[in-house]
């Protein structure tokens, strides 16, 4: 087992009982793969598959002109080089995008030629706007801010059958319906009404009998009846009627006459119900025809029309009822055989026949007209319009598309693979005629498709078949970034197509080129709108690495084409059994979106159709193999799947006689030999955030939900600290989120400082002729979207050997490459003077003093200088009537220095704006003329620090418009950036040269020369001393006798000069980017951004939380000496209320505290050993005991060298980190074993701590009195987070501020500098106390009495404290409102 560079330094002891069969997949794969499939940027144009952009283009092109003489074909597209990299885009507020160019071919046909001949062909590349690119971490940079496109969970296209659950009709009758949902196009619904007529509707419009649709499709009534019915045959004689007997059809009927066999024996007596036994008897007796009374025939419907053969007169139409008069007519016309429809009330309803009766439309064309009138009411139906509309509804590829998914789902549901025994004969006939349908097929509907849906719906009504469950994940699919972007792109292209069609006719005559035809505006605006302001495109939650990852793995049911919050019921939001392993049942927001926004489970991924699938281990011959299959929710229901915690023996066979398993989405116990699959991991069912909660299995689900959500709000602390009790997935999350820096290639660290790491790559990993250097520029003090601080710190030293993928620098909230959201705090569960009442948290002053929860927040403040009508605004230091103290920290350009500490109200950037001219008196004009311009016509509009903010200036950026001269500060910033870049290139060049000259030395040392510099003679050998005496570039002048070596020397010289040329061009490119003007909004000349770093210590009012949903607000910070302390004098860091645990049922926190206590105890033991300068062997033995002599995963301590063991021990002094994976973690016995190892009974420290029974509770002493508390207290270490709800951001007080326009009352909210609302109930309170003066003041001068409040101000200034209350403005508003209702209301003043 090999450990990475950082793992060696800190091993996590894992309590996992099961070997991991499959690694957790790359967590951002879904986003990256989806967008890569959309762009196909790295695939050559001729090898691209028909997905994404390629599919969008090929679905819209070719575009043919109306006359058909010109057409525009799509050849290929390519994405250019992005002009700026991600970092530059973020700084300049640009979109990180690449230009899209499309090669199109314009073909013009010769109009005059008799047969089609091509007149000319023009091919050209057309620019189609910019396509945003995804950063390597799965986000997009749009206008300088990072955004995420959230995947959408929507109803899969296909056909769905459901019923109304008896809610529509008062009788509670189930009304069945079917709905065909295409990917794009019109919805087609079929539904029964309470009278059992079958209707259809298009796009939820007015309903019409389904037979109208069938007639419009070209079916006659006879064909319709033949499709949906079996026939009964009757032979009509002069006397009596004979019936061809099909015994099966009589089952359950009551015999209306005696049924006799050939010998005249009674099989079924009259008025008896016919049973299965009777049917068997009839089949045995072999009767084929029986004579029946005429009443038996009356009332049945004819299967086909009947024509008098002699006269040609129509006697009866299809579906007519047989009456006595009709029978007489038939006998007259000599008709001796008729077919009637076989129907009964039980399982062969006559719905279609009844529906045909209420439909009075005679033929196909009239049916189409009826549909046209329903779709376009009030428009005159011309023949072309009618046909075009009907064809366009479901049969035109441009208008209607089921998509591959839709077709697959449709065929699976409407055409069953195997026909069941109970299927009716007419349906069996239909399926045999159509034949089996695979998963592929056209995107439009065919007549057979529509018939199949009606047939399945009728069978449902007949009581055969099941309805669909809409919330089943086999019926809901994921639309990821790529697909959403493709839809937007296609929509833009369709708009382009319309315009191009118009212009193509011009192209025939005007000799236009392709780029004259195509206007790319609609495409680029559709894309811009999608990425900039659509619902799926969200401002990335960047509080900490976990919130980034979770945001990218989010799946939302909201958005265009999805649900809305108001309409979504309970069923959609509920956890469904198919969520198992696909969507997390825990992590979802609290509030109106609960259940509509979900998170992907750890191992889940989407298949080619967009359905979520989850991995399972295959079980063959009772043996669990390591072969893994991904199953979607549709496939999963057919298998028996065992849970991951089933006990297995050495060979991978199940130990128990009964295994807990799932079959058909139900949980059951099954025999091992019936099991076909097994879960891959116990944590398979939860999401990333939930899998970070240790002992999740001991927490109530509601609290786990809060815990998962609150981890995403944890603010990165100044010094991150790994959790003592983790779940083992922390490293994966940190690495996959992209916050830490990982080595791209293996190598040796050549140079490290706080902002860059230079690695000399191993020769075997560097490609030939390539620069063997990796330079990692670290992100320093950068603002995240949530104003938290992103800062990377190197973990390596010069000379360290790295492998590919090793973590070499920590980012925000990571510690040695592991996610570290909070701090480990020594916690006691006890009440303390009421300060932890109702979840309040009491913390020690030491926590503040050690800066444990100090976080840095970065605020961006910007100011723009515009060109106004009165003249340009100016950024300057020269501002009148500002004291020198205010201007003291501005440089000569008027911009504050970096490093200045500023308070609210301080000037950051001086700016003046021209004021409007005032009319001058002649005297003033004269003075003006003499003394020149006065400074009074500008007003001070400087950028100041907003109220309630203070901090240190850490960065300033100046952007200047093209063509405007830069000030000294802007020039200096550019010079600094260039110097940094030059340093990078110089380092690269230095290492490349060192490497190259090292190779040259090895190549030519000891070789025979034929001459060279410093009088090297022919035949002399080249020595090391000789080479050292030469300048390195002179080595190339040495002439060697060995031609092969000489050639290699030549090659090295060429590659070196090539590298130098490349570096020079890179530098020039960078210089060009920096010195060209910046793109600024119109009218803006200059923009200055100032970044302030604000240090926030923890203080009362801040919100803190554990990982188990145990949240609270800091109530008091207590001096260290007053905190409860242990017998050895260790004071507590945090005191929590024990009443917060039992009712909330999150016991996980107690177990975490116990295990954390053990972790710290072990750390102290290791620390003591180091202090006593123990030998490496002794440390190794102890580590073996900790890691391998207990339950859980064993670690390979033997593979570490002695130095590595000591290094590891040093890092373990603060506590041995544990991993307790979800559902597979430490048991009570494991925790006790660890506590015994941490606090052995013979250790003096154990005796000193005065443990109660067990080692989880100790006697605590009151810091104020020194007395012991009367009962033992649970203490231990808990990982506690500080959440992004800081009192500094919420605290706010209003002095005189803005007022609302109409009511003249103060505004509300911190952003508006508003006041606190004094509402109706507060007024009642004052009334109840009889505080009349306070009440008057509240309702008048403090609120909306305009004259009164100015009066009060005057009085206070004069020093009189008196109030003259007037008329509140809201009363005037009320009067005006009443007057608007035409009621004249006035105040009578006496």
Swiss-Prot record:
BP-aspect Gene Ontology terms: DNA-templated transcription
Enzyme Commission identifier(s): 2.7.7.6
CDD domains: RNA_pol_B_RPB2
Reaction it catalyzes: RNA(n) + a ribonucleoside 5'-triphosphate = RNA(n+1) + diphosphate
GO molecular function annotations of the record: DNA binding; DNA-directed RNA polymerase activity; ribonucleoside binding
Keywords: DNA-directed RNA polymerase, Nucleotidyltransferase, Transcription, Transferase
SUPFAM superfamilies, per database record: beta and beta-prime subunits of DNA dependent RNA-polymerase (SSF64484)
Domain of life: Bacteria
Enzyme class label: transferase
Nucleotidyltransferase among keywords: yes
A Pfam family assignment: RNA_pol_Rpb2_7
Family stated for the protein in its record: Belongs to the RNA polymerase beta chain family.
Subunit architecture: The RNAP catalytic core consists of 2 alpha, 1 beta, 1 beta' and 1 omega subunit. When a sigma factor is associated with the core the holoenzyme is formed, which can initiate transcription.
NCBIfam families referenced in this protein's UniProt entry, alphabetically: PRK00405.1, rpoB
Role summary: DNA-dependent RNA polymerase catalyzes the transcription of DNA into RNA using the four ribonucleoside triphosphates as substrates.
Name of this chain's protein: DNA-directed RNA polymerase subunit beta
Protein source organism: Methylobacillus flagellatus (strain ATCC 51484 / DSM 6875 / VKM B-1610 / KT)
Lineage: Bacteria, Pseudomonadati, Pseudomonadota, Betaproteobacteria, Nitrosomonadales
């Amino acid at each position: 087992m090999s450990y990475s560079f950082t793992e060696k330094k800190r091993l996590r002891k894992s309590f996992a009982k099961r070997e991991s069969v499959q690694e957790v997949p790359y967590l951002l794969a879904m986003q990256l793969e989806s967008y890569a499939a959309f762009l196909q940027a790295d695939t050559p144009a001729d090898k691209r598959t028909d997905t994404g952009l390629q599919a969008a283009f090929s679905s819209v092109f070719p575009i043919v002109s109306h006359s058909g003489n010109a057409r525009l074909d799509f050849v290929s597209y390519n994405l250019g080089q992005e002009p700026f990299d991600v970092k530059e885009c973020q700084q300049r507020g640009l979109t990180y995008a690449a230009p899209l160019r499309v090669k199109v071919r314009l073909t013009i046909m010769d109009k005059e030629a008799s047969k089609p001949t091509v007149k000319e062909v023009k091919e050209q590349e057309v620019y189609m706007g910019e396509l945003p690119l995804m950063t390597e971490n799965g986000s997009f940079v749009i206008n300088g801010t990072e955004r995420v496109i959230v995947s959408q969970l929507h109803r899969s296209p296909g056909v769905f059958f459901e019923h109304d659950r008896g809610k529509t009709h008062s009788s509670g009758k189930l009304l069945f319906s079917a709905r065909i949902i295409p990917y794009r196009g019109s919805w087609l619904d079929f539904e029964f009404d309470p009278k059992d007529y079958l209707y259809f509707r298009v796009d939820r419009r007015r309903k019409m009998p389904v037979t109208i649709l069938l007639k419009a499709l070209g079916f006659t009534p006879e064909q319709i009846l033949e499709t949906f019915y079996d026939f009964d045959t009757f032979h009509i004689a002069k006397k009596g009627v004979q019936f061809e007997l099909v015994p099966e059809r009589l089952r359950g009927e009551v015999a209306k006459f005696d049924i006799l066999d050939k010998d005249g024996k009674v099989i079924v007596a009259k008025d008896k119900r016919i049973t299965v036994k009777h049917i068997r008897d009839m089949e045995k007796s072999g009767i084929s025809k029986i004579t029946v009374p005429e009443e038996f025939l009356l009332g049945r419907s004819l299967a086909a029309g009947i024509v008098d053969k002699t006269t040609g007169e129509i006697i009866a139409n299809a579906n007519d009822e047989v009456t006595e008069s009709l029978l007489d007519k038939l006998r007259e016309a000599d008709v001796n055989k008729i077919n009637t429809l076989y129907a009964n009330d039980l399982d062969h309803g006559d719905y279609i026949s009844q529906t045909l009766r209420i439909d009075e439309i005679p033929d196909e064309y009239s049916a189409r007209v009826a549909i046209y009138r329903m779709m376009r009411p009030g428009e005159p139906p011309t023949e072309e319009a009618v046909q075009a509309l009907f064809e366009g509804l479901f049969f035109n590829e441009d208008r209607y598309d089921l998509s591959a998914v839709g077709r697959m789902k449709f065929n699976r549901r409407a055409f069953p693979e195997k026909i069941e025994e109970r299927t009716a004969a007419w349906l069996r006939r239909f399926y045999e005629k159509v034949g089996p349908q695979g998963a592929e097929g056209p995107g439009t509907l065919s007549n057979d498709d529509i018939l199949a849906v009606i047939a399945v719906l009728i069978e449902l009504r007949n009581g055969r078949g099941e309805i669909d469950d809409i919330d089943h994940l086999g019926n809901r699919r994921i639309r990821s970034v790529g697909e959403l972007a493709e839809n937007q792109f296609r929509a833009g292209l369709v708009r382009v197509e319309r315009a191009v069609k118009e212009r193509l006719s011009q192209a025939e005559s005007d000799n236009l080129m392709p780029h004259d035809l195509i206007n790319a505006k609609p495409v680029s605006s559709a894309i811009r709108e999608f990425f900039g302001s659509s619902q799926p495109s969200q401002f990335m939650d960047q509080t900490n690495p976990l919130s980034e990852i979770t945001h990218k793995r989010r799946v939302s049911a909201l958005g265009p084409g999805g649900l809305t919050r108001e309409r979504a019921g309970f069923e959609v939001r509920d956890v469904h059994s198919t969520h198992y392993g696909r969507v997390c049942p825990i992590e979802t927001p609290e509030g109106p979106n609960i259940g509509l926004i979900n998170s992907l489970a750890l191992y889940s991924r989407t298949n080619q159709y967009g359905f979520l699938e989850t991995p399972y281990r295959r079980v063959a011959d009772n043996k669990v193999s390591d072969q893994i299959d991904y199953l979607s929710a549709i496939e999963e229901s057919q298998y028996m799947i065992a849970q991951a915690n089933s006990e297995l023996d050495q060979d991978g066979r199940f130990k128990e006689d009964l295994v807990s398993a799932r079959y058909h989405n139900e949980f059951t116990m099954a025999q091992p030999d019936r099991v076909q699959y097994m879960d891959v991991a116990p944590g398979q069912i939860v999401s990333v955030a939930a899998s970070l909660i240790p002992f999740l299995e001991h927490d109530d689900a509601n609290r786990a939900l809060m815990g998962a959500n609150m981890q995403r709000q944890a603010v990165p602390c100044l010094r991150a600290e790994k959790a003592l009790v983790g779940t083992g997935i922390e490293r994966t999350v940190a690495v996959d989120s992209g916050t830490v820096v990982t080595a791209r290639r293996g190598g040796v660290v050549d140079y490290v400082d706080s902002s860059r790491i230079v690695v000399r790559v191993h020769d075997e990993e560097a490609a030939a002729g390539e620069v063997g250097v990796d330079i990692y520029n670290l992100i320093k003090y950068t603002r995240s979207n949530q104003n938290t601080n992103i800062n990377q710190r190197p973990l390596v030293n010069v000379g360290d050997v790295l492998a590919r993928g090793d973590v070499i620098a920590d980012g925000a909230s990571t510690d040695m490459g592991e996610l570290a959201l909070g701090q480990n705090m020594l916690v006691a569960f006890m009440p303390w003077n009421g300060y932890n009442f109702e979840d309040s948290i009491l913390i020690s002053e030491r926590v503040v003093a050690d800066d444990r929860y100090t976080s840095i927040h970065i605020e961006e403040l910007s100011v723009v200088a515009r060109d106004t009508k009165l003249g340009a605004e100016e950024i300057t230091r020269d501002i009148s009537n500002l004291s020198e103290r205010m201007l003291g920290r501005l440089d000569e350009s008027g911009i504050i220095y970096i490093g200045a500490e500023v308070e609210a109200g301080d000037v950051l950037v001086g700016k003046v704006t021209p004021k409007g001219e005032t009319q001058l008196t002649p005297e003033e004009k004269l003075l003006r003329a003499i003394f020149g311009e006065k400074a009074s016509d500008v007003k001070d509009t400087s950028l100041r620090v907003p109220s309630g903010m203070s901090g240190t200036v850490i960065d300033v950026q100046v952007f200047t418009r093209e063509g405007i001269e830069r000030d000294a500060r802007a020039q200096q910033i550019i010079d600094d950036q260039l110097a940094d870049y030059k340093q990078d290139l110089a380092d690269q060049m230095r290492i490349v040269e060192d490497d190259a000259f090292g190779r040259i030395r090895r190549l030519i040392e000891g070789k025979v020369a034929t001459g060279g510099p410093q009088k090297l003679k022919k035949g002399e050998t080249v020595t090391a001393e000789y080479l050292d005496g030469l300048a390195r570039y002179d080595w190339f002048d040495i002439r060697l006798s060995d031609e092969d070596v000489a050639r290699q020397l030549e090659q090295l010289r060429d590659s070196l000069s090539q590298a130098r040329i490349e570096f020079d061009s890179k530098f020039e490119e960078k210089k060009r980017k920096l010195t060209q003007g910046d793109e600024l909004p119109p009218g803006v000349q200059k923009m200055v951004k100032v970044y302030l770093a604000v240090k926030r210590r923890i203080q009362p009012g801040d919100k803190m939380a554990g990982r188990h949903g145990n949240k609270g607000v800091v109530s008091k910070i207590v001096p260290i000496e007053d905190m409860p302390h242990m017998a050895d004098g260790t004071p507590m860091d945090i005191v929590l209320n024990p009443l917060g645990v039992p009712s909330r049922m999150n016991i996980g926190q107690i177990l975490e505290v116990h295990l954390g206590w053990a972790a710290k105890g072990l750390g102290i033991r290791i620390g003591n050993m180091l202090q006593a300068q123990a030998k490496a062997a002794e440390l190794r033995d102890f580590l073996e005991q900790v890691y391998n002599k207990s339950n859980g995963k064993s670690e390979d301590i033997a593979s570490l060298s002695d130095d590595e063991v000591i290094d590891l021990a040093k890092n373990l002094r603060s506590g041995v980190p544990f991993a307790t994976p979800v559902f597979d973690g430490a048991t009570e016995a494991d925790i006790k074993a660890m506590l015994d190892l941490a606090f052995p009974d013979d250790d003096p420290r154990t005796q000193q701590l005065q443990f109660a029974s067990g080692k989880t509770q100790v006697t605590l002493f009151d810091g104020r009195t020194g007395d012991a508390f009367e009962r033992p207290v649970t203490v231990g270490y808990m990982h506690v987070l500080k959440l992004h709800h800081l009192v500094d951001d919420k605290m706010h007080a209003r002095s005189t501020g803005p007022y609302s326009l109409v009511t003249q009352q103060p505004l509300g909210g911190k952003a508006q500098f508003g006041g606190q609302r004094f509402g109706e109930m507060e007024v009642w309170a004052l009334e109840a106390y009889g505080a009349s003066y306070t009440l008057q003041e509240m309702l008048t001068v403090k609120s909306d009495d305009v004259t009164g409040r100015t009066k009060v101000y005057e009085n206070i200034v004069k020093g009189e404290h008196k109030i003259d209350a007037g008329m509140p403005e809201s009363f005037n508003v009320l009067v005006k409102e009443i007057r608007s209702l035409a009621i004249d209301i006035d105040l009578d003043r006496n």
